[in-house]
């Protein structure tokens, strides 16, 4: 009698969960998706950035063409500092496209979900209104129980259910972890909330062109505005009055969000354009606390969590969805090799536990680098601290082109699916900027970046600004 097919239960029909489904389809691995909501695509007012490291994986899966047709690449970024008379223009988005063959581009989150959902051949594998109540596992497999009394069985349970992940909390329960105020005691220092964000989408704003990006850095807040096809995506990220924990983070009503925006309608976005020009054309908006987290333990037994459930960052770096897509990529690469080795033999509980622990250990440093870089970027944009103010006023405007190696390296060092061909591998930036693995983590590079900032100020003072040495360094 043949063994039943190896099967994965995905909790969450998110960008993460649907990307995983596409990868499993390519691998020929059975799966079921459980989604607690009544629809896959809902209008929530959120947009999502797809960077080259995420875009090339979507391209491997045959999904990028639809995304590319629906978006406009960012071209130049006009950055304004609190001093209204000081601004500079960065060609970083343009350089990203030339370097990797993929642009920085935004679209509505629901639009990306539609692309991912439409690409699923067998939609009967997706089950809506399936809120998870509890998970159990043993030597024979895993069972996921839902609110309607149904039970779904598989070999691995993957939590792709976001920041408030039920799967993660079930994993903590099975580990015997004490949970205090919604977070495992051992992870309590690994999540905090220090910023809020109002994000919105406006239609028909003629003052802003497709591909135009404006970054308005203020003391304690940042305004982002990106023009696309007939719409404008915008965010206002604001530092909170203190650092909050998960359970006591502020929650905002629609009325509070509207009042927040009304109070800022006179804020200048660019010459002749105030925030009111965008706000009065808003189609949808929302206000949320921005959690920042990097949990250390992602798996236990047959259960593994990925995406926002284990690492969450602010929107400033634009890597949230891309980091989740990378999680899927690394997990599926390891799963492919694992199942090929097992052939027809059913993997044991211990073997699966070892596989998922190895995934956690090997991918955690990459996720940590992205989360820490995002954390620094957010504070630089909001002018939090003297070092950050020095960086934005004296370093980036004059030396930004020479310091782009680090963010380009962050993109180039992302993983790819090792069982599908690359579509735009010929672009030289992937190899040129790829960072070799080393013991130097994000903390080292952040310290180096701040140190170089001070050195660059000295260089400006002493007239070194045009020296070729800065171009040759290209380390940050």
Swiss-Prot record:
An individual GO BP term: terpenoid biosynthetic process
Record EC number: 1.-.-.-
Family listed: Belongs to the paxM FAD-dependent monooxygenase family.
Keyword Cytoplasm among UniProt keywords: no
GO cellular component, one term: membrane
Coiled coil: none
Leader sequence segment: 1-21
Annotated Pfam families: FAD_binding_3
Name recorded for this polypeptide: FAD-dependent monooxygenase dpasE
Membrane topology: Single-pass membrane protein
Co-factor(s): FAD
A GO MF label: monooxygenase activity
Pathway annotation from the record: Secondary metabolite biosynthesis; terpenoid biosynthesis
Compartments (UniProt record): Membrane
Gene3D superfamilies referenced in this protein's UniProt entry, alphabetically: FAD/NAD(P)-binding domain
Main location: membrane
Binding site for FAD: 35, 49, 109, 308, 321
Biotechnology: Diterpenoid pyrones display various biological activities and subglutinol A shows insecticidal and anti-HIV activities.
Keyword Glycoprotein found: yes
Positions of glycan attachment: 190, 219
